[in-house]
Amino acid sequence: MDHGNDSALPSTIYTVTVNDALALDRPQGMAGEGLAHAGGLALLAMAGALQFSIAIAQILLALALLCWAAMLVIRRERFTAPAFFLPLAAYAGATLVSAAFSSDPRTSFVDCKQLVLFLIVPAVYRLVQGQTRTLITVVLTCAAVSAAVGVIQFGILHYDQLSQRPQGTLGHYMTYSGLLMTVIAIAVARLLFDSSDRTWAALVLPALAVAVALTSTRSAWVGVCAAVALLFALKDFRLFAILPIVAAVFFALAPGMITKRFVSMFDNKDPTRIDRVAMVHEGERMIAARPLTGVGPNMVEQRYADYRGDDAVNKINPHLHNNPLQIAAERGLPALAIWLWFVVALCRDLLRRFASGAQRFLAAAALAAVVALLTAGLFEYNFGDSEVLMLFLTVVTLPAAADTSRFQVVSRRSDHQAPLAADL
């Protein structure tokens, strides 16, 4: 045996892999991995449950957040999140400031509980990782079942009037259509950009499209059209040639009330259109009166009569049916600026990931979800709809969660940690 040349030994002794780092502290590593696995499963179940029950979905989210927080403590990991979480956190801070200056702080602070949903971003970022495609499949499958329920409600149970529309098992047709809108964006993105798993998306897409059409929710229709247009533009402009065919099929097969509802979007005498114009004026008055902090979270409905003009159709409205207008009136112009910062930061991140070529399907799906939310949000305050917001935050975080290049082995003198992300 030759003992004269040991110079090659360090290259094997000091090569540390991810599994080696976890094995150096086996009890903490096993506990942390168990929590990460449980939290990831809870998030997958949450994404599916959103299609059926907000209560079940939020219970699952609470379990996921508990697992995530416990894992950070046990494994002594630092908090990590995608870069776009910073403006989202700042928006939460601006909301709390607005609540403090509200005419009814108690009501406003109670409404601020929705800010907890923002933690979906770091939780999905850390816990989902290699399960991103599975999560998408779960969402598509559950949405297909929910869509079937909506079609049955319309065709058999006679949910075929504006006063009673298909809503699946959810509490409101606007939430139902908003979720379907986002899932349609995901399904079309998978068809156009995924290298595999296209079959299931192709099978469920017709049911999703029919269900969202039957809700008679015009804002969701606009969101779907905008999302699909973006995906066509990203893939191949020649795809726009099929749009006239789709339009012809729609008008040929859609029930009369659906086509009438579609045409009403262009009717200047439509009462809902007139009332939305009036809401813009109410919002402008609220902003002019309290530009810095707004009237306070969840206070638009209570203060609506104070700012209502003669052109208003409804005496009271729960919100202003427009994301930027609602945020500015409710939380102030600084909060709106921060929210726009979040949107820009998110879009830049997703465009960068799409251009890089890695996980193009997830990036395209997330971009389509953003466009759908923003365009539909010109006619509906969907950023304040908990179910829609939960699915939206989950989908837009998936490209970052799937980015394995963010992991690195971190070794310390006292302990060895699992790979950590370094975006924040």
Predicted features by range, described:
Residues 331-371:
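Hydrophobic transmembrane alpha-helices and their immediate junctions
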Residues 3, 148, 232-272, 278-289, ...:
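A membrane-periplasm/extracellular boundary helix in multi-pass inner-membrane enzymes
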Residues 55-71, 111-123, 175-184, 221-229, ...:
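Membrane-embedded alpha-helical segments of multi-pass membrane proteins
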